[in-house]
Amino acid sequence: MFDVLMYLFETYIHNEPEMRVDQDQLTDDLAQAGFHRDDIYNALNWLEKLADLQEGENAPYFMDADPLAMRIYTEEEGVRLDASCRGFLLFLEQIQVLNLETREMVIDRVMALDNTEFDLEDLKWVVLMVLFNIPGYESAYQQMEELLFEVNEGYLH
């Protein structure tokens, strides 16, 4: 499913954000690109749930949290998000790329992935996808994009 999300983000969403695509046509295009239908449906469902999180009432755990409180991760979250991932999320909060709500959206979407393997690079892409899908967070998205691509470019040299 994560491969489908990455492909969608790089091919459709990031390059043509205003483009409207028929879901059936998109499913067929992705199947022709070699993705399994189950992965395609799971990825599209993942994106729908991301859109639902923006509504607020679908994620009531955002509402009562104290912004100064320290986030304690559940055992399952700690397994999926290792120390480097959790540290990176804290770093993103400290530099104000993420806030309480967007951090929780990222964690929610990470936990919804069906990957058995998940690392810091995957987390960076999930953060980018979440920020891209929230109106008004263009600056945070741009900062995250710079962080992602500056680090990746450093490996090429």
UniProtKB/Swiss-Prot annotation:
One Pfam family it belongs to: DUF494
Entries under InterPro entries matching the protein: Smg
NCBIfam families: PRK03430.1 (NF002897)
Family of this protein: Belongs to the Smg family.
Name of this chain's protein: Protein Smg
Native organism: Serratia proteamaculans (strain 568)
Source lineage: Bacteria, Pseudomonadati, Pseudomonadota, Gammaproteobacteria, Enterobacterales
Gene that this sequence comes from: smg
